[in-house]
Amino acid sequence: MNLYISILILIISLIIFFKNNNRISKINSKIPGPIRLPIFGNLLQINKDPHIQFQKWYEKYGVIYSIRLGNIETVVFTGYPIFKKAFIENSQIFAPRFQHLSRFEANGCKNLIGSNDEIHSTLKKLILTEITSNKIKKMENHIVLECENLCKQLDKHCQDGLPFSLNMYFKLFSLNIILRFLFGTINNSYQDKSNQDIVDVIIEFLHYGGNPIMSDFIPILKPFYKQNKFFKFYPILCDHLNKLIENYKNNKQLQKQQKQQQNEDDDDDDDGTIIGKLLKEYHNGKISWTSVVSTCVDVFLAGVDSTSNSTIFTLIALVNNSNCQEKLFNEIKNNLKKSDDGHDEIVIRHSLYRSSIPYLSLVMKEVYRLYSVILIGLPHITSEDVEIEGYKIAKGTQIIQNVFSTHLCEKTFPMSKSFIPERFIETGSNNMFGGGQTNLVHFGTGVRDCVGKSLADCEIFTVLATLINRYQFINPTLEPLNDIGSFGIAYQPPINNFIIKKRL
């Protein structure tokens, strides 16, 4: 009997599949792309490194091509000119997020990253008010303090001179900073086992969350979809953030009681935290509790992982290109101001030195290009029929941004696989290595770009300038450091060992 029921479900699913996709596939039929298999489409061609397969399709079919992932008709864009036409010039059509079943089951797509319409507008506006350039400058002391704490840890490795991995140090560094912005929490410990454990959960979640979940594309497989480890790690993250939120609320209540005991006015001023603003919107009935927790998860993940990954990839690149490391050190040294006691500053602030250390900005851009944290953008969906570059794209089509291939385009970035920071020197057409800031899409394009990009730039600039000025990073082996990361929602850097020598 179960066999007959399974066959009946399969037949019904196939009928629904062909009915729903007939219109989309007809409209999208002129877009080039690979041959699709029945039911699976091109899903089985995507392995553990989807960006590599997307690159192969791009090389064969061009900047716009069509694939089908299970029952979902998909169009892939490559290159900033196409991104601009879609996500800037036609932003209302391309802005909505495609909401897969797995994401909807996880948080109802009520988080900052996954939501659409009024929910997304409310959450984005709220987060942006807490990470403006002025607020980042006011909060810069948090980054300075964390840089000082990190240097204390790294100084110990200078003394023993042994090779060691930097990855966990930078994850914890970024974790401490984002906790300050999210909750106003100060945590200076790099030996806290619970923090290391949650970092491990973040890494695992971002790895498994980046790989296709089959039931998102073939609904008949829904009974098996929770076997994916995405559903193991996301609840752990939500529980962790829930505890942090409860700690914040308890601390606020304690502060309120203390003020009452001391007959002080409880004016409930804005404490400058993101969670404070989220809770205010929640109590005003503008967002749900799910939005509060899941948006905290979004900010927590991005704050811990994206900036630390870019920093690690930068140090790998600077060790493998030692001439770039020395060039950067010399520029920092030559432009550094003396403190009142005549010594060099320990922490090099973004607000003070951003314009006087231009080579660091070039290095950061080249890392954003060559080691983009996002290789394949989170999916969008078209809200109506549209035409891009002569191709008709139907309403309901999933849209994917091919960031990896965009940044490796030889036409835009000659010698694209080489680390050449000088390619971003703004010299117009005379720069033989291409460049131009607008061709970088690592922070996204249009209304869905990264809300934390200013904070990320500030944090990465400050820690890199500080560390390169203070230490020389050395490869302990004769072979170049491995710079091939692992695919996920965020591109994860490999584990390498470094030797560091103190310069100051």
UniProtKB/Swiss-Prot annotation:
Q: Which keywords does this chain's UniProt record carry?
A: Heme, Iron, Membrane, Metal-binding, Monooxygenase, Oxidoreductase, Transmembrane, Transmembrane helix
EC identifiers of the protein = 1.14.-.-
Q: What kind of membrane protein is this, topologically?
A: Single-pass membrane protein
Q: Where can this protein be found?
A: Membrane
Positions of heme binding: 450
User: Gene of origin?
Assistant: cyp513E1
List the source organism: Dictyostelium discoideum
Lineage of the organism = Eukaryota, Amoebozoa, Evosea, Eumycetozoa, Dictyostelia
Instruction: Please list every transmembrane segment annotated in the UniProt record, as residue ranges.
Output: 1-21
Q: Name one GO cellular component term.
A: membrane
- List cofactor names only: heme
Q: What is this protein called?
A: Probable cytochrome P450 513E1
